[in-house]
């Protein structure tokens, strides 16, 4: 169904988009580091909450992408467009609700999640959280539209929009932080403006009726409960999985925040830099939703396996190069962030250990996207949620508080989480039970 040229056309823009996202994330942290470690720490704490929200919205978009991909596999573009309208409606309403909660509960939520943190860190976190919350509805629109274009195998639209969004963000950061000396607000305001621009651009483009999947030109999205249920059947388990994953990271971040500013800053910078190692798997995972979803929709189970195996091999090939480069360059890269010697030492150690452990990651996080594309979302959710609470959270507290391993204990617990997921997902994949055993029309909940 997909030639290697088709796969390259889908995956290369996705990888570029992921690179852009990581580079902009790095630029944010580097620029705000000029304000001080308290600013870096405040932004890092808020980013862990924002990532939870973003992953929740992304899971809903994934549900829509799976439904649309399976309809396209069955050559049913009409229902694919109906699903697109309902996806846009659902994600926007959810994002507005989340924004209101975040704006109203600003300081209370931060205090509830992270407990007693230093006053200057809290002040920076409050400012950044407020501005981040305003951007959530725009980001939801962008994510939903990007997912729709990926389901068509057209990822160029989202990467071009992402390029525009990130350019606005970086230029805005430089102007507001270095030129206007606005501190953390100088990072937050360009985030709002850039995400608003991206959301509006994608909303204009996705209304084009010439595209295989499109939404109503006048945004008369309608209300189709059955179609929304189809999307939620995929999106809710994926959302619970992603939300629990990010909630676990927040709880771990709360644990790290008790270790002092140097540990928070070192942990934040290490997390920022190792994002490069996630790039191929994240992009390939997004591509799997399209490729495997269409194969399953068309009933081509053998091809679904074939493409999954091929994409995992590509993931490992790119990852090997990135891991070697990041390990070799870890010290000079950390030096960019203007950290204290203690924080720099922590960051370098975390990066080196992380690079070796990444051999587990593709099977733990890229492979389950193939299962989700085949609607096998309950298994991935149960496995991920159990692993998160047992290993990433539970073991982190044991290693940090019981064995006094500091932030390295958090890293070790994370690797244990990866290993458990990888074993169960690999067994599930090899068994073939992730593939639907019923007529394909049921795969999208008709």
Residue spans for each PLM region:
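N-terminal transmembrane alpha-helices
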Residues: 2-30, 34-35, 51-63, 92-99, ...
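Residue-level hotspots within the lipid-embedded alpha helices of multi-pass solute transporters
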Residues: 18-22, 55, 95, 99, ...
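Interfacial/gating helices of multi-pass transporter permease domains
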Residues: 32-51, 119-127, 184-185, 226-234, ...
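Small-residue-rich hydrophobic transmembrane alpha-helices
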Residues: 40-100, 139-158, 264-330, 361-384
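Short runs within selected transmembrane alpha-helices of multi-pass transporters and secretion channels
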Residues: 61, 131-150, 158-166, 187-202, ...
């Amino acid at each position: 169904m997909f030639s290697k040229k088709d796969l390259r056309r889908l995956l290369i823009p996705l990888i570029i988009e992921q690179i852009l996202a990581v580079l902009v994330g790095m630029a944010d942290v580097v620029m705000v580091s000029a304000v001080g470690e308290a600013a870096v720490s405040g932004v890092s704490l808020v980013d862990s909450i924002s990532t939870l929200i973003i992953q929740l919205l992304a899971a809903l978009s994934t549900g829509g992408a799976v439904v649309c991909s399976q309809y396209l596999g069955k050559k049913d573009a009409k229902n694919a467009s109906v699903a697109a309208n309902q996806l846009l409606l659902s994600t926007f309403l959810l994002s507005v609700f989340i924004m209101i909660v975040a704006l109203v509960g600003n300081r209370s939520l931060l205090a509830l999640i992270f407990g007693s943190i230093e006053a200057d860190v809290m002040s920076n976190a409050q400012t950044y959280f407020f501005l981040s919350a305003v951007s959530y509805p725009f980001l939801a629109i962008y994510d939903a539209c990007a997912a729709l274009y990926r389901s068509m195998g057209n990822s160029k639209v989202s990467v071009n929009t992402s390029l525009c969004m990130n350019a606005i963000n970086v230029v805005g950061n430089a102007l507001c932080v270095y030129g206007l000396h606005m501190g953390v607000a100088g990072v937050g305001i360009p985030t709002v403006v850039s995400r608003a621009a991206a959301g509006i651009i994608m909303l204009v483009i996705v209304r084009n009726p010439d595209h295989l999947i499109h939404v109503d030109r006048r945004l008369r999205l309608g209300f189709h409960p059955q179609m929304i249920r189809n999307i939620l059947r995929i999106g809710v388990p994926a959302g619970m999985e992603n939300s629990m994953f990010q909630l676990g990271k927040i709880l771990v971040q709360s644990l790290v925040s008790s270790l002092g500013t140097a540990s928070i800053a070192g942990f934040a910078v290490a997390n920022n830099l190792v994002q490069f190692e996630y790039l191929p798997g994240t992009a390939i995972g997004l591509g799997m939703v399209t490729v495997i979803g269409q194969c399953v929709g068309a009933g081509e189970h053998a091809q679904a396996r074939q493409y999954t195996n091929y994409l995992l091999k590509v993931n490992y090939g790119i990852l090997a190069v990135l891991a070697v480069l990041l390990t070799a360059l870890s010290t000079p890269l950390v030096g960019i962030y203007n950290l204290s010697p203690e924080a720099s030492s922590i960051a370098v150690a975390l990066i080196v250990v992380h690079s070796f452990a990444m051999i587990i990651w593709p099977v733990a996080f890229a492979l389950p996207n193939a299962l989700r594309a085949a609607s096998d979302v309950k298994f991935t959710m149960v496995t991920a949620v159990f692993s998160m609470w047992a290993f990433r959270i539970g073991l982190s507290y044991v290693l940090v508080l019981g064995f006094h391993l500091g932030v390295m204990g958090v890293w070790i617990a994370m690797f244990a989480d990866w290993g458990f997921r990888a074993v169960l997902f690999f067994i599930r994949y090899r068994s073939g039970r992730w593939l639907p055993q019923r007529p394909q029309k049921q795969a999208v909940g008709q």
